[in-house]
Amino acid sequence: MDGVAYLIKMKYKTDKIGQNISSEEKRKIYVSERALTRTEYFKAGQNGMNPRIMLTTAAVNYSGESVIEYENMRYGIYRTYHKFDSDEIELYLHKQAGT
């Protein structure tokens, strides 16, 4: 693993007057950056995604988060892939509005 990323989980609490207050919980993980294939880029683009990066990390690091921070940029995680014979998971990232 040659880089660091932060998986971001949103947490919500209700305050005294019933308003939902959101907060973020960041968790540091080690990742490796991989190139997106042309096929992945094309298929994601067909579905309205703006694919940017694919990262790999140990599968135990990922708990269903949908936002990640990598190299001071926020991305949405639009797809994951976990090979049955590997302890790594692939995280496919896209730039989305609001991240």
Predicted regions, residues:
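Active-site-proximal polar cores
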Residues: M1-N20
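Short, conserved turn/kink motifs that form compact alpha/beta structural patches or helix kinks used as
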Residues: Q19-T99
